[in-house]
Amino acid sequence: MNGLCCCTPCKPRYRRLVDSIYPRAVTDGLLHSNMQKLTFYAISHPEKLERIGEYLVMRMVRDLNRQRPVQVKIAVEAMDQLLQACHSSPSLPQFSENHLRMVQRLLESNNAKMEQLATDSFVTFSNIEESSPSYHRQYDFFIDKFSQMCHANPQAAYGEDFRLARCAGLRGLRGVVWKSVTDDLHPNIWEQQHMDKIVPSILFNLQEPDDNGGFSSSHIPKFDNNFTDSTQSHRGDDEATPKVLSDRCLRELMGKASFGSLRAVIEPVLKHMDLHKRWSPPPSFAIHVFRAIIYSIQSQNSYFVIQELINHLDSMCSADASTRIGIATVLSSIVSIAGTSIGPLLLSIFNSLLKHLRTSVDFERSGKCSDQPAEKMYQEALINAMGDFANALPDYQKVEMMMFTVGNIPNLDERKSKQGEEFLQHVLVKTLLKVATKYRTAYLATVFTDSFLDTLLRLALVRDPQVRLATQQIFHTLLDRHDNAANLVHLGYELDVADVQLTVEKCSRADQMFMRKHIGDITYMLWRAAAAADETDLSTHADAILCTMSLLCIESLVELFRLSMALQQLALDTKQNFSDAKRNSIHNIVAKYMNLSAQLIANPSLCQQVQHVVGCRAQRGIPGLNLLLSVKESPMNDDPLSSTAVNGTIPEGTPRTITEGDHALLFNIEDVAESLKASGKDASRLFVPFNMSLNGRDGNGDSWQREDGQNFDSTDGRESPDGYKTVGIDDVSVDMSVDWTPPISRKQSRRNTIFSIVNPPKLNASTVDDLKAYANASFDPIEEDRKEKELTGSILSEIRNTDFEERVNTNESLNERGDLSKSIARLLVRNGETTKVRDIGRPTKPKNVFEIELPSFAY
């Protein structure tokens, strides 16, 4: 029938209208007046729309085969105008199929200009919202063709126009995604087979190198608008390059992906990074891609991207260190963006990072690691990732992360630990420090739970000096609530503490209760940390200890004065194998802290004592003890005795450190106590001896011996200064301020009243000479046996020959207060006499009826 209608009068009306839009001259374009007639006819007769499309496609194919580009463009333009005008027609799905056939024939021509024309027409089609769904439409061909165009290169048929071909391919893929997402009953564009073509095509253009040969995102604008692009005239200057356009395509693709489709998109991204080695440091391209992904998807789905990256890191555990470093760096860069949505998987993700950290440490220490510096960089990247991860979390989750990190630190309770475990301690403490720097302490009891504080106190006393130093820095970070640590970390001798610019506030009641419970353990840790300070880095460790003491100054004033006196005595102890430099460093810690605390509490007498001691030390010229050298306006600098250290010449006979006989160079505990009492402080705790000694071992299992012979075990329990054994670190309750009352002694306790030992055996004086004599005395077993038999015989004879009542009376007569009943009777008598004296001169109280005596005749 079509062949018979060869003459114009015999053609159907819709064909005559289609033929009329073509001009007679080749140079003329589409006849718009006739195009309006065709459009009106198509709208008025929707049943003819499908046939109009078929006829236009037939003419376009004929013109394409005859290489008539002008007629081809006219047919494409007519199809686009009809598509836009008849978007609500019931015949639009059938017309759309004809339109897609036309686009397909143009793309199959392998002509760059025709492909560009087809892409523009397809983008126009993708912006049409169809009122009725399409049940059989497929876009497989378009995905394949547009992906192929995205990989155009100068050696192909495109020549110098390969960038235009890439842009056309990207816009075509963008149109496919948009049309697939918006259509009802759309084909599943999120299938893995489609994403394996779309995502690599986008990333291939996004990774296009710049003029310097590397990747740079400085010229890529941030797109926040929705997808809008209809024709070539709508493409602005921001989409002139494939890199800019591919970035926008990636963001739109991720923005339209649902939670169930994320895996299909993320997996091709990870595979592309592996194949193109985009993880190699610095992974700027990978960071840009994943940041674009995180910012484009819904915020509640951000944790899924983090989890996929960690799973990919699991699968790459045997890869090169550079690859793992790149993945960890990407995690560190994007984890803060997704931090607010990771709540449900917080510990799972953090545990995965810690597991990779432990695996890296074990691999480095196994001897199989060929590139240890790269492995250390990988560990640093993981630590930074955990720190950045913590920075985006609320405070209560940061505390959970710190507790979780502490729980992974190995072998703190064992007596000996392996070298690899010590290194793991060092790495995990660095991780803990990184997380702690992101936390802002409000109340001490909130962050310093019993188990957490116990672990920190143990970490501060391990073998590794770097771990001890990092633990002190953790204390600085968590104790510092007013940003004072930066001014205290290298505190010198200040004539005026106001120059340090410290922020001082009154201690809260909650912090007072916390310090009352735990200050004993903290001061003990500081004392041992000073004793175990590394000789090779004395100044750093001394500054760290001084900073911790200064941060605790307000919360526990008297106890830290007591610690200072103990540190001074430690520096004077000749039994300790300390160098002169270490002794002088401890003396300087005491002097600097005394100077700071005296000025903070505004105690003039104590400030005068500190200045006197520091001035005497400067005059003596002992190397390392002249704290006035750093003070510009010091009156002591003009003294000839103090200038010896400045000139670098030390006279012969000048001592290298302070001895116990140099009373003028030492702080007197009685003078300090008097100064504190004058300012209204209770200084009774200063005289409680700080009797810990260093006879134990220095390591992880901590068992220490006190000077009075009582064993001290930091894991099982400890003896208090008054002789009471406490259960453990969490039960210690000692003074931290001025309102402390000493506990009742055992002799005054009611549980030891009747059967107490009144005359305890007299012990020998525990002086050094007596102990040496006792230790060097020869042991005579016969004499010891004789004395034991005599003591046993005397006790047995007393029991056999003396009655029990007589022995009880003898014991009571020695100490009447030992009898509880007699003590009560004595108190009653005394109270009765006091009442009688008080009632003298007062009128007699009337007797009650039970006290009136009857007359004698009544009997």
Swiss-Prot record:
Skewed-composition ranges (Basic and acidic residues): 704-722
Do you know which Pfam families this protein is assigned to? EFR3_ARM
Q: What is this protein called?
A: Protein EFR3 homolog
**Which taxonomic lineage does the organism of this UniProt entry have?**
Eukaryota, Metazoa, Ecdysozoa, Nematoda, Chromadorea
Q: Return the similarity comment.
A: Belongs to the EFR3 family.
Family annotation (InterPro entries): ARM-like (IPR011989), ARM-type_fold (IPR016024), EFR3-like_ARM (IPR049152), EFR3_Homologs (IPR051851)
Q: Which domain of life is it from?
A: Eukaryota
Q: Which GO terms describe its biological process?
A: protein localization to plasma membrane
Native organism is Caenorhabditis briggsae
* Gene Ontology terms: cellular component: plasma membrane
Gene name, Swiss-Prot/TrEMBL: efr-3
Region Disordered, as annotated, extends over: 638-657, 697-724
